[in-house]
Amino acid sequence: MPWIQLKIDTDNQHADTLSDLLMEEGSLSITLEDGKDTPIFEPTLGETPLWNHTVLTALFEADRDLSIVVDNLKLQPFLGADFSYKIEQVEDKDWEREWMDNFHPIKFGERLWICPSWREIPDPEAVNIILDPGLAFGTGTHPTTALCLEWLDSLNFDNKEVIDFGCGSGILAVAALKLGATKVTGIDIDYQAIDASKANAERNGVEDQLTLYLPEDQPENLKADILVANILAGPLRELAPLIAEKVKPGGQLALSGLLQEQALEVAEFYTQWFDMDEPAHKEEWSRLTGIRK
């Protein structure tokens, strides 16, 4: 069944009101997108931010007369008669198949591959992780996850224990175990992340070596030879003492989730405990690494 969609340029002040009006006009779904590729980082608790320039897309059944919808919208004072819009036909597709076709195996470093379950493994002799896109946690496609995976691929994990601080999907924890770590502890504030990490560890046959905790449940004096934290600049600054105390002397640290302009400032929070390396960059993102003093 074909569809028709109405695209409207709006702003963060009127996006919600416009969404409600379009639903009243019979829209089947509303999508809000950034109109100018403006990133949003670290919203405050309970905040659902929108972009200053927002593109709203309303999907309708193909037989809906959108000229009537547009005429009704022109009566709204915040839009007026000359508001910008576009009407497009939407071809009916097998959306699930189209979505799956967008994901392919990705190589990180010299040994490590992340492979969707429906794809053939490119190199059976490599270190392969089976991971499907799902919850809004890392799958390797984001530059910060890629930076962490490349760093993990470069390490020697013989007799090493690892902490994945902010484990999300568990991709970094599973990678460390597949690369040879003896044990990984994953910590996350989100119980859905704990469930996702557990499921991905089971899928990859490393669940017996992975222990998962919410922060309030983690053991006292938990320490590891290697700690990786792919979270955000704010928590990395705030939690620097806690993160530092979890790394054994001589242990290795990697921090990501940072924009390039945040990297050096965040690194300063760790220099009293770590000998920090120069940041590594991918696109606008950075990774910090260091050795515990």
From Swiss-Prot:
Binding annotation for S-adenosyl-L-methionine: 145, 166, 188, 230
Instruction: Identify which top EC class this enzyme belongs to.
Output: transferase
Q: Which UniProt keywords apply?
A: Cytoplasm, Methyltransferase, S-adenosyl-L-methionine, Transferase
Q: Its Enzyme Commission number?
A: 2.1.1.-
What's a single GO MF annotation on this record?
protein-lysine N-methyltransferase activity
Cellular-component GO terms for this entry: cytosol
Which compartments is it annotated to reside in? Cytoplasm
Q: Which reaction does it catalyse?
A: L-lysyl-[protein] + 3 S-adenosyl-L-methionine = N(6),N(6),N(6)-trimethyl-L-lysyl-[protein] + 3 S-adenosyl-L-homocysteine + 3 H(+)
An example Gene Ontology biological process:
methylation
Instruction: Extract the InterPro entries matched here.
Output: Ribosomal_L11_MeTrfase_PrmA, Ribosomal_PrmA_MeTrfase, SAM-dependent_MTases_sf
Q: Which family does it belong to?
A: Belongs to the methyltransferase superfamily. PrmA family.
Q: What does this protein do?
A: Methylates ribosomal protein L11.
Protein name per UniProt: Ribosomal protein L11 methyltransferase
The opening ranks of the lineage are: Bacteria, Pseudomonadati, Pseudomonadota, Gammaproteobacteria, Alteromonadales
